[in-house]
């Protein structure tokens, strides 16, 4: 089982947020993984 933190999703906008203890672990552990039949991309948050 893959352990990760709290997950929230945007209102059908194709994005979500995952809370990890370490940014590098989040990117390396989840980038490219299958989530509910979709291949996901994980990167650091960008300010608008």
Curated annotation (Swiss-Prot):
PROSITE patterns: RRM (PS50102). It holds the Pfam family RRM_1. The keyword RNA-binding applies. GO terms for molecular function: RNA binding. InterPro entries: Nucleotide-bd_a/b_plait_sf, RBD_domain_sf, RNA-bind/splicing_reg, RRM_dom. Keywords: RNA-binding. This is Glycine-rich RNA-binding protein 3.
């Amino acid at each position: 089982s893959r352990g990760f933190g709290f997950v929230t999703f945007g209102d059908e906008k194709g994005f979500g947020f995952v809370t990890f203890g370490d940014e590098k672990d989040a990117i390396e552990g989840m980038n490219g993984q299958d989530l509910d039949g979709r291949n996901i991309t994980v990167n650091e948050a960008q300010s608008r």
